[in-house]
Amino acid sequence: MMSFLPYFSAETWTLLALLITLIVVYGYWPYGVFTKMGIPGPKPLPYFGTMLEYKKGFTNFDTECFQKYGRIWGIYDGRQPVLCIMDKSMIKTVLIKECYNIFTNRRNFHLNGELFDALSVAEDDTWRRIRSVLSPSFTSGRLKEMFGIMKQHSSTLLSGMKKQADKDQTIEVKEFFGPYSMDVVTSTAFSVDIDSLNNPSDPFVSNVKKMLKFDLFNPLFLLVALFPFTGPILEKMKFSFFPTAVTDFFYASLAKIKSGRDTGNSTNRVDFLQLMIDSQKGSDTKTGEEQTKGLTDHEILSQAMIFIFAGYETSSSTMSFLAYNLATNHHVMTKLQEEIDTVFPNKAPIQYEALMQMDYLDCVLNESLRLYPIAPRLERVAKKTVEINGIVIPKDCIVLVPTWTLHRDPEIWSDPEEFKPERFSKENKESIDPYTYMPFGAGPRNCIGMRFALIMIKLAMVEILQSFTFSVCDETEIPLEMDNQGLLMPKRPIKLRLEARRNTPSNTTATTLKSPTT
């Protein structure tokens, strides 16, 4: 070794020492942020920060930190400081009061590929403009118009489930709820009927499933987290978290549908796509100049694609968790079926107004969303340094609300792991702080399709429970283990037994039952 040393000059040794020093400093430099703020949290490792803790799962890590550090703590995703908050007043300030001025945007790695202008990642004025164009698609009047279309697909769902029930086999519930969600979304949004339940190999379904295969420890994700300066470089090189073949398929398919509208092949109903196209009228949206209202052609395709992705995954997962909760809590399912038999005796067709007035159905769905919020974390980025409740949050810091953990806080929810729909009864609902229950987010940047999803879920579940019951089987995993994904989903498919109901109450019997009020 000693004979090797002289071959390096003093300048070389100086440069090597400087390089090593820079590497060490780079690895440790960002991790003093929360110490200076007096914020507790797990000890970060050089370069990785606290990311390796995610091997436990997002939800487990967040809950562990809450139990150890209290309602405010700091973590590091690579070099990125993330302030986690479960204080109600801070949550309100971040999501509501200062949404437009400071906390407008979500975290964005800028590796979204063609989805760079989708509503979910759009920022500031671009987000406001796109949101204002899309909002009319989700008014009560529009949703009521879509209800008839939803019923067509819920009927197909029911037929498919009946075939499976007749075989007396266990079912992977998402294999039914996924196609139903896809069919409802494509038909209401673009007036395109896929019938994916009977065509499981349809490219729309197979491609959307490929989009969901996101690994937290994906090399691309790790590279950007550990070396943030590579993000803009990778973006310029067209790298994306989403498979290129998948996004190319959807953009080509949606462009073809839009082209048909542009050439006069219009639909009889005003759907999601048509409302976006109409926004272009009177606006020059193809020149790339500053937009004042209408959407560009590319923005239209991006919103259509994110609507497919979000509508498929969030709705089908919510329905799967709801079926699981009913199967593992038979007394709740029985009570819900009593309400269904009262409101719609003798398997009467589902009517929109009556469905919206079902109190216990609301309670059950809300409680399922409390236990399994599809977005287990809400994130916002501080556009400038701000002080909230005596805490100075630096510019570019991520502020994170751990929804999963918040929804299971024993100081807020008694027996938080128990499935108790009565928490959301009319008597109890008023006492629930809106900043402790946020399955769809909160504030101006909440989920725009929330009411659409709830109607679709309620309709399908009521029609299913008119004819069937869910029950656990040997293959049902209890409790569920969550996967390490951005959206909440079980690590393994939820498998249940579906059985035809016997002795469904007659019209006379059903109408004598009192509608549950808790």
Swiss-Prot record:
Database matches in InterPro entries: Cyt_P450 (IPR001128), Cyt_P450_CS (IPR017972), Cyt_P450_E_CYP3A (IPR008072), Cyt_P450_E_grp-II (IPR002402), Cyt_P450_sf (IPR036396), Cytochrome_P450_3A (IPR050705)
Top-level taxon in the UniProt lineage: Eukaryota
Keyword Oxidoreductase attributed: yes
GO cellular component term of the entry, any: endoplasmic reticulum membrane
GO molecular function, one term: oxidoreductase activity, acting on paired donors, with incorporation or reduction of molecular oxygen, reduced flavin or flavoprotein as one donor, and incorporation of one atom of oxygen
Essential cofactor(s): heme
Spans through the membrane: none
Topology relative to the membrane: Peripheral membrane protein
Catalytic activity: an organic molecule + reduced [NADPH--hemoprotein reductase] + O2 = an alcohol + oxidized [NADPH--hemoprotein reductase] + H2O + H(+)
Protein role: Cytochromes P450 are a group of heme-thiolate monooxygenases. In liver microsomes, this enzyme is involved in an NADPH-dependent electron transport pathway. It oxidizes a variety of structurally unrelated compounds, including steroids, fatty acids, and xenobiotics.
Protein name: Cytochrome P450 3A27
